[in-house]
Amino acid sequence: PIVLDYIMDSEVPKPCRHFIGRDKELEELYTMLEENRHVFLCGIAGIGKSELAKAYAKHYKKHYTNILYVEYTGNLHQDITDMDFIDDLPESTEQERFQRHNRFLRSLKSDTLLIIDNFNVTATQDSFLSVVLKYRCQILFTTRSKLDEYCTLPLKEIENMNALFQLASVFYSEADTYRATVEKIIETVHSHTFAVELAAKLLENGISTPDQLLTRLQVEKASFHNEDKIKIIKDGQSSKATYYSHIHTLFSLYTLSLEQQDIMCNMCFLPSTGISARIFAKWLELPTLNEINDLIETGFVQTTTRRTISLHPMIQEITLSETKPSVTRCHILLDSLQHICLMHGMEVDYYKKLFQTIGNIIELIEKDDIPKYLLFLENAFPYMDNYNYHKGMNGIIQELKCLLKTKSIGTDSDRALLLDFQATLETKPEKAIKLEKDALAQIENIT
């Protein structure tokens, strides 16, 4: 465990307390990792890949000297750079940090297990995968992608009805009384782990009776199947759609208050690793954590032992399409983040999560108020510069370039700032000076 003292924030989150029905898979995983060193645990969203990985770490922790956990954010090179080593110097560049971290990870032997959670890309999309696969430690990836060229363990539904019924009874106290109906509900949602959990929580909250829920799911399933007869499952897409439709039905049975819908809408931008509930409540100016706690009870909002909250990936996708977060709708969140970024002298210890959230906003938000959005980006950039957060700075430059291409968008000062930002990241002094001169020329037009 020496490594955990050296790399902060890299311990494996604990699996949920009610982890059941996967004994065979745990053993298979152990054998595969022993024989192949690197294993990709694949399966559709909500089937329990991340939970199995966490349970594996807990179950076999005596077999390893170190177990490290990294949540994939879309770029392996960046995720390794962003690991928190205790002797990282604040003034070191991203490149230096990356080289030190990579060198250290390369030195680890097979008594270390590295878990890379939510690696949802193809091998060609993340060119750095081939480098990571040269590490000598054991690596367990969880992924929704089909990566057939590697050693994979496909995770299917839990077949044992008793185990699934047990899971439902953890969340639904009257499951025994309505056993027959609950089992039918489990069959109707195709034994999909996350759907079973949501259904049980829905019943526990008294929002509908087991019979009502079963009828509703069956009706939805029948209409879905009629539309879907033509599409024979070619790529697993249609089965994925079926699961989404179940989750969607369960989601729509809740009548969420406007405040709760708003919270969910803003939570779409949180990094998948989650953020402290208190910090998030402060960003949204919520007087209490009550609404968030109610959402945790429904199962839509996930929480870990560290009191961090995030949306389940399936719920995030549904929330995005249902609530359509926009600059106007999420103005309180944007104002709060902008406010933090304007306090240049003030350091926040969660800056990485803050910047990941800003990155997700750029990617997902509807830009329905361009002047406000431009100001938001222009205030975020210098704050990222304080922390040498180049990934985010590049993201802002790309977004500004894209927006300011259109003549009617933005002002001369917006264009001057973009040139100034590009100069900040330019490594060649003569190029940087030229960019600054161009920026000044833009401003002369104004004065």
Task: Describe these PLM feature segments.
Residues 1-28, 32, 54-55, 211-222:
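Charged, amphipathic alpha-helical interface modules that flank catalytic cores or transmembrane segments
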Residues 15-20, 24-109:
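Post-nucleotide-binding-loop coupling segment downstream of the phosphate-binding loop, primarily
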Residues 54, 197-204, 247-323, 330-331:
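C-terminal boundary/linker of central alpha/beta nucleotide-binding cores
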Residues 104-124:
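Conserved P-loop NTPase "ATPase switch" module shared by AAA+ and STAND
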Residues 164, 202-260:
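Loop-to-helix "switch" segment enriched in basic
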Residues 206-226, 259-261, 320-345, 350-354:
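A eukaryote-biased feature capturing mid-to-C-terminal, repeat/solenoid-rich segments of large proteins
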Residues 328-410:
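Extended alpha-helical scaffolding segments used for macromolecular assembly and cargo binding
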